[in-house]
């Protein structure tokens, strides 16, 4: 694994990395320290970064407005 990018957004951490198959993936760590790994694969780090930011936006909205 080769880390390409680490970004902090609204209490979340986005990690974009290249795996041994030379494809890119992302993981998110939330504000409580829980890591979320995704099965998506991307050809570029930029694409993984965009999708990771979108995932953080969804998680942030969900945490901001709980669905009890």
What function would you assign to each model-found segment?
Residues 33-47:
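A short, exposed loop/beta-hairpin motif centered on an aromatic-Gly-Thr core
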Residues 43-61:
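A short, charged, amphipathic alpha-helix used as a generic interaction element across diverse proteins
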Residues 1-24:
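Short N-terminal "domain-start" leader segments
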Residues 64-68:
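Short acidic DE-rich linear segments
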Residues 30:
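Short, acidic, Ser/Thr-enriched surface-loop or helix-capping motifs
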